[in-house]
Structures are given as structure tokens and as C-alpha cells.
């Protein structure tokens, strides 16, 4: 996992294709280090991402909405028409940054 802080947001990049483990490792960071930060999850390297994988982030996305913070996932492998409206997914990092700013 690679974390890059910017002025208005933090980008967390997943380094492996084990999304269950990534979410498991991410959750403690969300409670402390990344608390109160707008968050971009960079999953561009995951070319086999499925809707099932995306739903691993549902609880995190919901918590960010309650906290009035942005939570955006970046992945271009998913079909935009099959995505739940509750989770924001964009195909590029630039679009994710634009959504937060």
C-alpha cells in the first residue's frame, strides 16, 4: 500500500490484487492516520476488478458519506452501468481529484 498526501486529499494505491487484504489493512488507517481526510483509492492496476470486489468498499464509502468526506475509487476495468450509485468510481486519477476539488 502506498499513501500520498495532497492538500485536500490523500491517495492510497493498492500494490497487489488481493483486495480483501487491502481493505483489511486500510480500515485501521481510516480510524487514525486517514481520519478526516478526503480519500482517493487508486485501483488502476487491478484490471480484473469485479462488482464483488467493489462492494468490499461499501462500508468505508458509507462511513465517509456520514462524515461528510469524499471517498472516490479509481478503476477503469469496471462497467460504469453496473456500478451502485452509493460508491463513486471514476476511470482516471484526474477525474477523482476534480471530484474532490
For each predicted feature, which ranges?
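STAS-typified acidic loop motif
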Residues: 1-28
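Short aromatic-glycine-(Arg/Gly/Cys) micro-motifs in beta-strand/loop hairpins
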Residues: 6, 61-83
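Short, solvent-exposed loop/turn segments at secondary-structure boundaries
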Residues: 51-53, 84-87
Amino acid at each position: 500500500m502506498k499513501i500520498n498526501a495532497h492538500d485536500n486529499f490523500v491517495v492510497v494505491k493498492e500494490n497487489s490484487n488481493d483486495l480483501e487484504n487491502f481493505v483489511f489493512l486500510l480500515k485501521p488507517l481510516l480510524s487514525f492516520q486517514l481520519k478526516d481526510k478526503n480519500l482517493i483509492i487508486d485501483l488502476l492496476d487491478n484490471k480484473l476488478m469485479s462488482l464483488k470486489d467493489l462492494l468490499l468498499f461499501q462500508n468505508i464509502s458509507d462511513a465517509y458519506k456520514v462524515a461528510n468526506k469524499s471517498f472516490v475509487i479509481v478503476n477503469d476495468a469496471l462497467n460504469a452501468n453496473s456500478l451502485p450509485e452509493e460508491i463513486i468510481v471514476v476511470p482516471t486519477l484526474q477525474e477523482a481529484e476534480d471530484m474532490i476539488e
